[in-house]
Amino acid sequence: MQTLADLLNTIPAIDPAAMSRAQRHIDGLLKPVGSLGRLEALAIQLAGMPGLNGIPHVGKKAVLVMCADHGVWEEGVAISPKEVTAIQAENMTRGTTGVCVLAAQAGANVYVIDVGIDTAEPIPGLINMRVARGSGNIASAPAMSRHQAEKLLLDVICYTRELAKNGVTLFGVGELGMANTTPAAAIVSTITGRAPEEVVGIGANLPTDKLANKIDVVRRAITLNQPNPQDGVDVLAKVGGFDLVGMAGVMLGAASCGLPVLLDGFLSYAAALAACQMSPAIKPYLIPSHLSAEKGARIALSHLGLEPYLNMEMRLGEGSGAALAMPIIEAACAIYNNMGELAASNIVLPGNTTSDLNS
């Protein structure tokens, strides 16, 4: 049986030769060089992913939503009742939540995965990977054991790889869990080295008079648990949550297949920071969908070296931003595969040389 270390070692490097070929191809299309901006860069990035075999394309699309409760909810860091996690997860099975509507619009399937919802019985219609009924309260204990974190990572990686075997070529990550912006902020603070007050935001409309308590909870969690910022698993286990671990697993699993994964908002940035500590090789496979309105978003993205494609002032989570950005990926593939070539039209533009076009 493969271990987590075994799977991390399978993550392939991006193919620079394929990216160079894609650059020459795109420069020879019916347009001035660089005139489609970041869409061109995205197509070239996709061409370098081994799982796409040098040709940017989209097969099946999937948004994986990791659902879990958090013991830190007891600290008064969220105004929504904890039961909302289970209620919204059930609503996802009916296709009525934000991510479900946006994913349907994008032609993507939504996989709702219970990795730690606090209910007595599993919720019908959810994929059951539950580790426990919620994580530990990070203000007074670790979120989980390292063994639990590693096992969940491995389970989600394997599940993601199985979806890839069944034709999924574009993944999106999402989450659901009351109070989960608190552990996310703790992860971002730990790995970036920024102070809690710089990264803690209001989450799901936390009143501003409760923000000081949330900042204090994050500070206490880091001080108590002493997560090692160089060890992504340690950070997730000590100050994270099962939903954050699950998202990191999707990223690692997609990258191990040489396939792209769309990030969502602040929670996914935190998971990505931890995943990149485990394997920096995954970074070229991460595509930032949108700029979360949550405080600390820019800090996390800057540390990742990523610039989001959309700025919609969204902070819903669920994978809503990932679903919304899927047509951008398809657009990048479309220009690469369907545009005509300058050479075939006898057009010569500055910056488009004959040697470029015929290489």
Curated annotation (Swiss-Prot):
It comes from the Bacteria. It holds the Pfam family DBI_PRT. The keyword Glycosyltransferase applies. GO terms for molecular function: nicotinate-nucleotide-dimethylbenzimidazole phosphoribosyltransferase activity. Pathway: Nucleoside biosynthesis; alpha-ribazole biosynthesis; alpha-ribazole from 5,6-dimethylbenzimidazole: step 1/2. Its EC number is 2.4.2.21. The keyword Transferase applies. Keywords: Cobalamin biosynthesis, Glycosyltransferase, Transferase. It catalyses: 5,6-dimethylbenzimidazole + nicotinate beta-D-ribonucleotide = alpha-ribazole 5'-phosphate + nicotinate + H(+). The active site is at 318 (proton acceptor). NCBIfam families: cobT_DBIPRT, PRK00105.1. Belongs to the CobT family. Homodimer. Catalyzes the synthesis of alpha-ribazole-5'-phosphate from nicotinate mononucleotide (NAMN) and 5,6-dimethylbenzimidazole (DMB). PANTHER family: NICOTINATE-NUCLEOTIDE--DIMETHYLBENZIMIDAZOLE PHOSPHORIBOSYLTRANSFERASE (PTHR43463:SF1). This is Nicotinate-nucleotide--dimethylbenzimidazole phosphoribosyltransferase. It comes from Escherichia coli O139:H28 (strain E24377A / ETEC). The lineage of its organism: Bacteria, Pseudomonadati, Pseudomonadota, Gammaproteobacteria, Enterobacterales.
